[in-house]
Structures are given as structure tokens and as C-alpha cells.
């Protein structure tokens, strides 16, 4: 047995539905830093403990940050809904020694293929936010958001506790903007 704390802790939130597309404001969080004076002693709150936090945010237009695929007749992949993917049979990869090109994989059309990040409807994870109150670095006008936090410590007897995390947001200023162009001689 040993004493001490893990050097890294990771938290990933569930998807957060904002109810409608919004503009994001600041990311606020409360991190407490602790240090244990030594073996068998209770940790105490210490602001100077070498504990860091990196909080990343991503935003999306739909309720899944993943895209699901099944195999086609010619071995390619086609995107399907999560429900269609879950109904498809799992991939059973069979290795054959006697194929035209010296062996390979037999894949059956309709089987589950890859699950990838949905880069069409979801942003990449933002650059890390290291201080509370920073402006959120994720695209606005999105309805869904997800947060992940990494709390790291350089010493075995220090750790951090994330007490709260909140996202400032506001309604969109306009859902759509329409402009008209007319010749100066023919105003409308």
C-alpha cells in the first residue's frame, strides 16, 4: 500500500442542452488546492499547492458529438443514426489466408463500423481554460455544450477539488439577419 494522490484527475460532463442556440460568455469554476503534511495526516487547504486545472469546452448543433457508421457492400463506410448503428450486427472480422492479394479481412455489409467525432455538427475541444472567468472559446449559436476538466498535480501529496463549474450564456441577438441590395438610383 502507498499514500498520496493521483497525479491527474479527469472529469467529462454529460451533454448540456441549453434549450435553444445561445451565445456563450465566460467559464467560471471554483478549484480548491490541498496539501497533505505527510503520511497518515489529513490534507489541508493550501492555495499555493502546485495543482493546475485545464478546462476544455466544445459546442454542437445536435444531441450527439459522435457520428456512427456501418459497412457498405464494397467495404466503405456510410454514416447512419445511432439507433441504426445499435441495430446493426457487431463487426466480426474474419481473416482469410487465401485471398487474391495474400490475405485480408472479410467484412460483411451492414455490420457496425467506426464511431468518430462528429466534426460537421460539433466543434473541436477548445484550447484549455486555465483561469476562472475566461471567455469560452467555443463557437456560439449552438444549443449543446460539453465540458471536460483535467486537474493535475506535480507532487504526490497535493490534489485539487473542483467544487463548481458554470457557463455564462445569453440568447442570440438575432436568429437570422436579412439584407437587401438595391441600386442607388432605384431605392426600394
Regions from the PLM with identified roles:
Residues 1-188:
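Beta-strand-rich ligand- or partner-binding modules
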